[in-house]
Structures are given as C-alpha cells and as structure tokens.
Amino acid sequence: MSPKSSKVAGIDLAGSERRATGFCLLEGNRARVSVLHTDEEILRAVGKGVRAAAIDAPLSLPRGRCCLKDDCPCVGKAHFRVCDLELRRMGIKFFPITLGPMRQLTLRGLRLKEKLESRGIEVFETYPGAAQDIWGIPRQKNPQGLKRGLSRFKVGGSWPRPDVTKDELDALTCALVARDYLRGITMAIGDPEEGLMVLPKTGKRLEV
C-alpha cells in the first residue's frame, strides 16, 4: 500500500473522557471526522488498517521527570522538553505540560499511545496549532478561516459540513500531518531519547 493511499488517524485528544475529542480517519483524499469521548470509542473508531496515528497531546515527559506529581522529588527537574523549547524558538505558542490541565492530558495521551502501539500502529505527537502556523493558515480561534485553509488540501469526505467543530478541524490537521509523515515530508523536533514532535516542514505555507 502506497503512502498516498494509506489510512491514518488524527486525534485532537481531550484531557478528560467527559470532554470532546476530535477524531479523523483519513484514507487517500477522503476524511471522516467525528467527536468522541472515551478511549474505548477512540480505539473502536481507529479500527483496522491504520498505519500511523498523530495525537495532539504530549507523549513524553521532560528529561529527569518520572511523573508529573507535585510531591515527587522529580518535581524540581525540567518543566520543558527539548521539543517545547524548539517550538518557543520558532515563535509558536504552546502550553507547558506541567501546567495543571496539561498533566491530565499527558497521562491520557501516554495511555492511549500504548494501546494503539499494541495494535502495531505507529504513534507520534503532533501539535495542530504549530502545523497551522507553519502552513500559514488560521488556528481554531478562527474556525471559518481554518476551514478555508484546510480546504486547500483538496480533501473530501464528511469534514466540510457547516457544523464541523474546532476539535474535528484540529483532528483533520493531525491526520494530514500523519499522511505527510508517511510520505516523508515532515520534520521531527526534539530529542529522540526524550521524545519527538512531528510537524510539517517549515516553508510549506499555503495560499489561503
């Protein structure tokens, strides 16, 4: 199966199963998006045949950290990963993983990664806000602008509907990064021993 026709998943993960997670299954130029909640729903939606999954959630801890607990001796270690610092150098805004709500998201992301990898799926972290910045299209704060920007990829399917959510648009962004990853046209930032983040190659701006 060629990378062009391979099936990939994009997951805009929420920190809690009570909140909406955006999900996208992308095969070739057809995308199916939905809003899910539980890990079980996500695993069921991934189904079979997915080669790669890109998740919008931290999937590694800063060097020297064994956990994100405040009462652990490791709390005095690093608060930023190398990939986080590289985002900062690129001028891309992000939330540090030691920030309150991000801790829960990180732990959920790590659990989901393990479950997906047990199925033989290649799983990696991405950041749709960074991808959108690199492509030169609006972030989800401007959903109509983001929708117009993503339409430049000429992807059909269920996602262009009028009531598509911000989470689903970010999930589609993640899936597009996963597809580009299989095509060998992405870059990885960070420290391989600590954890990498996969993003579009810089200079790939779109005309919006």
PLM-predicted stretches and their roles:
Residues M1-V208:
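Phosphate- and other anionic-substrate recognition elements at nucleic-acid/protein interfaces
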